[in-house]
């Protein structure tokens, strides 16, 4: 009995213990299941996996769900991480963890929420009519290819150069006043014979002929002026000093000819100083917003809709955007424009909703249809140029007293009308006789000029095959055969003012050289560095001018001058009628000191000269032919800055071991009279042609003659170095080449030496050095 009871009791205790152990296991499995389900839910939500709406659609079989991805290639809306999800799109969590069945069977999300592109959507809408396309046409040859793909092997900063199409360069500009003033980059319009500006509005686009009002190479800015047929929409130049690193910005422009292209980024840094293609710039804004060829001159825009920079350059190893772009600060652009125009629009509201602009309408006249309502046939009371505009551009037109209103003539003709001579008399009597004829018609130069395709750039008379001589801007027109009615820039290169040097034409083959690696640090020395201008009405800036093109003293140049590399600055070219020329500086000199301070880089010369007021006599220590001498340079106004000649883009290297040969070289038997050397064809030896209206051109050494380049083969060594047709080669490795015999001897000596070849070149009254 006792034994039996003991067995029963033991068995009972054993069964109870087994049940308790099973409960623990079941509870543990439940907890693990809950954790797994909850983790899966969190993972799907955080990894962008299957969305709740899609999960419910699968479970409930709903076919009419609204929140479905965009189909047929239409991109779905992207939600900015900083934006909150709309309340109607949120889904309540399940009532119990892991209980999928507790979701409601159908959830009505309503219409799909419209997700905007953030605060910049309204900004782009605000500025879409303030950004223009700038086309600069210049004479030249073919675009030079880059067969090796070495566009910029050093990865140095270079200008976001305009898209080059043969001899047309396409950039971007910003309307800064609604009466036709536009800011763009200097390098977009530099050397252009004609400039065209395409302005867009809500209806279409209008192409205007533009006038270059002002240029500043140190700032890389240019001010254009067009005569608008309608009121324009001006952008507001904001305060670039108020922009902080990491602030969001957008870049608007015409990359590769694709107008109104918008890219987004941030302000990556603020650069105190930076050298771009030989020019020292200050306070540039660095951004990662995409800037490409054609973006030059376009706006960099802050979230409040104001322009905080003018896109100008990129840092790239291969010519493509590499995430580093630079913009001229808007404060510099404002001062640059104010020196000429007197006033600019200012914002009256801040923040993303900004849209009101003060001083946008001079003398209180409304913009667009904001003027008072007037009756049809009311004569224009204006005398400031608006009397030539269509009244409907600013006013709403109501019928006259008899209730009848004549049909309005559209500004743009629906069908392109025929081209007409510039002096044609308007045959219209329906009101169009009061309009500007080029609103509808394209002008041709004169009675003998044939029609040209509508909408193409106007070239009334084809320029001669040989480039005409450079002339001064105010030179009198000597023609009487109809060309007196033409724009002189159609055939001639225009020099800005008395003593100004010709603006160098585009690089070899007609392509702008901004896309090539800057081998020399040639710099237009003027101050304040970076182009800080003075506020209008201050009596001008304290800027000083040297008037010389400088380059660092390299090791080979140092050997030639018996100086260690970096001690001094090499003078690569001197502009006539500038302080540098008056002081006696010559190409080939080495500047050792400026105002008693040693200099080692062109930027140091720029910084010292920037401190000097106008009229100050500055002592310059110069090394020439082994002798050190001091020169007194009197600084001049910054208005002469555009006169400085551009140094060649190739590295300047003095060829050693090639002494100057005095006297006349002995005539070598069978001297050729035509030369085909390094891609150059040379047939003629001549004295340089004088530049019309420009005294003080540099005389040619060695008897006054040189070897004229008849043609340059595209892609050749000569083309890559920057030589152009009609250049006059004065010296080859310090040997004068005034005759075929001398050139032949110089070529043979240079070939035998096996070194780089240094050419002294004369172009448009200027001498400079080019290395081959």
From Swiss-Prot:
Name of one Pfam family that matches: MCR
UniProt entry tagged with the keyword Transit peptide: no
Protein name in the entry: Magnetosome formation protease MamE
Lineage per the UniProt record: Bacteria, Pseudomonadati, Pseudomonadota, Alphaproteobacteria, Rhodospirillales
InterPro entries (alphabetical): Chloro_Bact_Ser_Proteases, Cyt_c-like_dom, MCR, Multihaem_cyt_sf, PDZ, PDZ_6, PDZ_sf, Peptidase_S1_PA
Example GO biological process: proteolysis
Segments on the Cytoplasmic side according to the record's topology features: 1-21
Species: Magnetospirillum gryphiswaldense (strain DSM 6361 / JCM 21280 / NBRC 15271 / MSR-1)
Coiled coil spans: none
Extra remark: There is a third MCR motif in this protein (470-494) that is not present in the M.magneticum strain AMB-1 MamE ortholog. This bacteria makes up to 60 cubo-octahedral magnetosomes of about 45 nm in diameter which contain membrane-bound crystals of magnetite (Fe(3)O(4)).
